[in-house]
Every structure is written in structure tokens, then in C-alpha cells.
Amino acid sequence: MLSYLIGCAFGRWDIRYATGEQAAPELPDPFAPLPVCPPGQLQNAQGLPARPEDVPATYPITIQWDGIIADDPTHPVDIERCVREVIEVIWKDRANAIEQEACEILGVNSLRDYFRRPAGFFADHLKRYSKSRRQAPTYWPLSTASGSFTLWIYYHRLDDQTLYKCIQQFIDPKLADVEKELTHLRAVLAANEGGAKERKRLEELETLRRELIELRTELELWAPKWKPNLNDGVLITAAPLWKLFHLPKWQKDLKACWQELEKGDYDWSHLAYTLWPDRVREKCKSDRSLAIAHGLEDLCDVKAPEKKVKKAKKKAVVELDLEGGNE
């Protein structure tokens, strides 16, 4: 359920189906071509994923079109606040009871507790979006070392500006707030006006400040180089950011994928060409399939195989002696 609620907040799913404002879509003809969007997705008039201009001003919730939501109670785009908005629109006066029941079923004290634990929402989400060896989580948590601050990003909205937006719209404002509170607490303690509570809060903020700077540094490192292309798949696209995921199994898989990328095992990917263009271009000279994948056939020294002309098979002609002369 919570995966659906987050999807509504990101604009993946159309909440009006859940409220009854729109009738459930008809079952498609089993022999018809597959639609671009699955049933229930927020779509435009052409049946494509909706964009901001496609959604009316009367739409029931605020959609996070940038594809970024913070786990931060002080931020207006906070994951608990966004999910609660969806719950309130769907269940109205039963919203609090539904939220409490969900927390009891999940065995957590609050929705935030469930989202913040590495073995909570993301572990369940990863399991649900994995099949055989394919792992394709849609909602990614990029976290500080302790998990005290997390940015949830929506895979299908990734672009080359996503990491810059994470820094400018979320991390920098948070750092400014932390610095302001630190300055105040230091002044209070310097004047001998504070006690154990203030000293503990000071330690917490100093740790948070250090971790936010580490998170910012890692994102700043990748922001100019990371050009996500969804055709590469989830694992390859997320691999450079492996340090920011804290579910052990997922981090291990991403790190292994990153090491394989560095070795050149996935040079067919757009990400590999973005990060190591010279290496990929050199390989394209002797690998025609790789050259075709990157649109670099002009670099390839291997000629395309000539098409073989199929010769028409001669039909065997059987002559029957109707006169009986071949007895």
C-alpha cells in the first residue's frame, strides 16, 4: 500500500482512481498492443505519462514533479507529510486510523520509522520489484551515514539535473538551518545558560552537519558526470551512487556492478560512454555491435557483413508416364 501512496505523491499513479473521481479503466483487449502506461498511471490525453501541464489545477494532491522527496520533518516536501496528504485524500476522516493500522501491521512506531530503516520500506520495495536476477526498485533512498537524513528519488524522473537539485533544494537549505541552530547553541553554552539537553543537541547537530557535508560532497562529485539513461537499467544507473545506499545487499550489488563498469564489462551502456568515452570509442573500432550501440559505426574498422543472396531452390519435377511406357 505504501508503495502506491508514494507513487501517488510522485505522480506515478493517478489518485483519482482511488477516490472514485475517475472510473476504473476498462480491461484492455488481450489481443491489443500493449499500452505505453500501465492501468492506473497518471496519463495525458494521448495515453503517455503526464507532465505538469497535463494535470488540472484541481488535482487533489501536490505532485513532486522533480522526483525528489526528503525524509526531514522540517522540510515542506517531507515523505511522511506527502504520504499523509495522500492518505487524507483517499480515506478522509478515517486517515488517522488507517495510518495507525498500517504502522501496527508493519510493526513500527511511525511511518517515518518505517521509511528510515534500511530494512524497512526500501527492503520491502526492493523485494517486490525483484524477479529472478533482475532488481529494479523505483524509489531510491540516498542517505547520510547514520540515515538521519534521506532523499528519496524517483527513478523515472531522473535526469542530469537531479543531483544538482538534491544539493541546491534540499541539502544546502538543511545545512544552513543546522549551522544557524549550532551557532545559537554554542552561544547559549558559552554563556553557561545551557545544560545536558543543550550539550546533547549540540553533539547531534555536529554529527548531522558532518554527515550532510559528506553526502553533499559525494553528490557534488557525481553531479557533473552522472547522465542517467533509463535504457541502461536500474542497477547500472544507480551503481555510481552505491555509497549512499545503506541496505547491505543492495549496496553490495551496486558496488559489484560499479567495479564491473570500471573494468569495462558494461561498455555497451550509455553510462560507460559518458564516464569513459575514450575507452569506449577505442573498443568501437574493433567491435561493430558496440559501435552500433553507441551510434559510432563510422569509427569501426570491421565492415558490415555482406548480405547473402538466397538462391531460389529448384523444384523437383516428377514426370508421370500416363501411357504406361515405363513399365
Task: Give the positions of each predicted feature.
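Terminal accessory regions of large proteins
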Residues: 2-327
